[in-house]
Structure formats: C-alpha cells, structure tokens
C-alpha cells in the first residue's frame, strides 16, 4: 500500500446546481473539492498531499520544498499540510504577479501567517515565466539537497503536486465520485475541471479507468499546453494505474480531452468569459469560483453548452478544485467581476 496521511474531510459534497441547470439546459452537478478541509481554504491539492506527505514521512523527511506562483494555491495548501504534519515548509515562488511588500494578500499572506520559509524568484529581463519557473526548480532541488546533506532530510514536492504519488489522490477522488453517482442512481456524461500542472487530470483519468466509467473528462487549461503535455498526463495516469496494481491503460488520443481556448491572455490574467462565469455562478447559486483556475474552467463548460459541444439535457459534473482566495489577490488578477 502507498503511505498516506489523513488530512482532508472526504467524501466532499456533491449535489445539483438547480438554478444553473435551468439556465443552461443541462443537469449540472458540482463536486465541492473546495471543501476538502485542512483550513478554511481547502482545495484539490489536499487529495495529493495526503500521499505526497505520507511518502515524505515514510522516508523520514523533516522538511518539504515546493514551487508555484506567488499566489499559488498548491503552495499554501502544502504549507498548511506541513504544519499539520510537523514538517518545515519551504517555498520557491515565481513572481508572475509582483507582490506588494506593504500589501501582502491572499495565499501569500496565509503562507506568511503560517511561517513558511519563502523565496521569491523574480522573472529576469529577457526571461519567460517558464524560464524563471525552471530556475526555481533548480534552486529548490539544490536547497533540498543541502538540507538533506546537513542532516535534515528534505522532500521535494513538484509544482502542483503533479507526480504519480500525488495523482493517486485524484484516482481516489474519481472513485469517490463514482460512489456518490451510484447512490443517486446517476450516469454522468461529462466531467469538467481546470488543469494546470496535470496531476489532477492524470489522477481523474486513472480513477475513471478503475471504475469503468464512460464519462468524458474535459480539461480546461489555465495556461498554454501542447501535445507534450498530453503525453506527460498519459504517462502519469498509467504510472498511477501501475502503482495501484492495475494493468489498465490511459490512451492519450482516445481518452484525453483538453481545451486550451479559455486561459488567454495568460496564467493569472483575467478574461471576460471567466469574469462572466464567476458572476453567473455567484448570482444564480451564491457560490464562488476564482479568476485563475475554476472561473476559466467554468467559462469553458458554459461555452461548450452554448455551442452544442455538450448536448442539452446532458448530465454534467463541474469539479470545483478550490482557489477562491484568488478573489482577494492583487487587483490585476481579478478582472471585472462585479
């Protein structure tokens, strides 16, 4: 068995969004992974961190290093989980949005409240976000190696928790959803979610194979992605299946459905469709999605319904992966949401 530490409150709620369903002409259900717990601002990463930190503790680690943008949900949830487990959290955060030292907000504020060791990695002139991110990975790995060599074993958690260890948490998540669907006697046609680093996507596909579901999983990207990304997700999913002792396989060309049409103009940059989706859900259901991840995924789903990519009357699940702290982040991330 894979080592696991209990962090979240599962199963997370699952129910129908009656007013949104009526508005859109489909049966729209929501999976509330913003309710995974740990702290007030839970999210999908808790599922992964149960296995990642379980692995870290099984290996005798005392510290954890991880990565993200300055307002990373994953980084904040990792710090929270580390504190719960008695591990020292170290963050290497890329300044996609430059934080204001005098006005620290949202996830970065929470990281500081929890006392994480934070290293801000600025994007140098002539560098892309990806370049700076790659540099942060090297810095973090070197930091972990130094600590380990000096007698404090340090565990390196990849950005977004996207590893075969972390993705087991999301294979479990899909199995959990399947059990909730069974209880309600429901067949689902589509599952929609936001994808960033690919760990959630890989886990969902592994879980779908394990339960033999016919649901089509559609992944709305929050940053530019290409074919290499799909290959990475396929390989991650297949590693998860192998880890769980299954000989089933995810086939990139048959199983993976990714739409890159909703992240523009870029990561952590708002757009009109996401702003409309945020307002629609808030005004019809009193629920919140964020401008970086879930708002863009919901915008993709709404657009797919309106353009007939999702047939009227379909049963659709929107997987809420959390991240509403972004509503309290720097203004340039927000867009026109009221």
Enumerate the language-model features and the residues they cover.
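PLP-dependent amino-acid enzyme catalytic core
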Residues: 1-338
């Amino acid at each position: 068995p894979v080592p696991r530490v209990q962090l979240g409150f599962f199963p997370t709620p699952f129910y129908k969004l009656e007013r949104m369903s009526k508005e859109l002409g489909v049966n729209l259900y929501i999976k509330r992974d913003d309710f995974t717990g740990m702290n007030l601002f839970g999210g999908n990463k808790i599922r992964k961190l149960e296995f990642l930190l379980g692995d870290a503790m099984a290996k005798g680690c005392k510290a954890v290093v991880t990565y993200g943008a300055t307002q990373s949900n994953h980084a904040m949830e990792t710090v929270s989980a580390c504190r719960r487990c008695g591990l020292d959290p170290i963050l290497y955060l890329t300044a996609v949005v430059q934080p204001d030292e005098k006005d620290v907000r949202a996830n970065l504020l929470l990281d500081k409240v929890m006392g994480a060791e934070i290293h801000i990695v600025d994007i140098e002139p002539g560098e892309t976000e990806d370049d700076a991110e790659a540099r942060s990975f090297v810095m973090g790995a070197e930091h972990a190696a130094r600590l380990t060599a000096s007698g404090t074993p340090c565990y390196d958690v990849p950005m977004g928790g996207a590893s075969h260890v972390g993705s087991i948490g999301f294979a479990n998540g899909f199995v959990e959803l399947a059990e909730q669907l069974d209880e309600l006697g429901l067949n689902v046609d589509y599952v929609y979610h936001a994808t960033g680093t690919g760990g959630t996507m890989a886990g969902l596909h592994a879980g779908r194979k394990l339960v033999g579901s016919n649901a089509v999983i559609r992944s709305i990207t929050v940053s530019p992605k290409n074919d290499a990304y799909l290959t990475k997700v396929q390989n991650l999913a297949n590693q998860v299946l192998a880890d769980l002792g299954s000989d089933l396989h995810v086939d990139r060309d048959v199983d993976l459905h990714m739409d890159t049409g909703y992240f523009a103009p870029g990561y952590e940059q708002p757009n009109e469709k996401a702003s409309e989706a945020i307002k629609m859900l808030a005004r019809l259901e009193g629920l919140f999605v964020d401008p970086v991840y879930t708002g863009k995924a919901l915008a993709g789903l709404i657009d797919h319904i309106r353009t007939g990519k999702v047939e009227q009357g379909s049963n659709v699940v929107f997987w809420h992966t959390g991240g509403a702290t972004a509503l309290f982040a720097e203004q340039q991330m927000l867009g026109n949401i009221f």
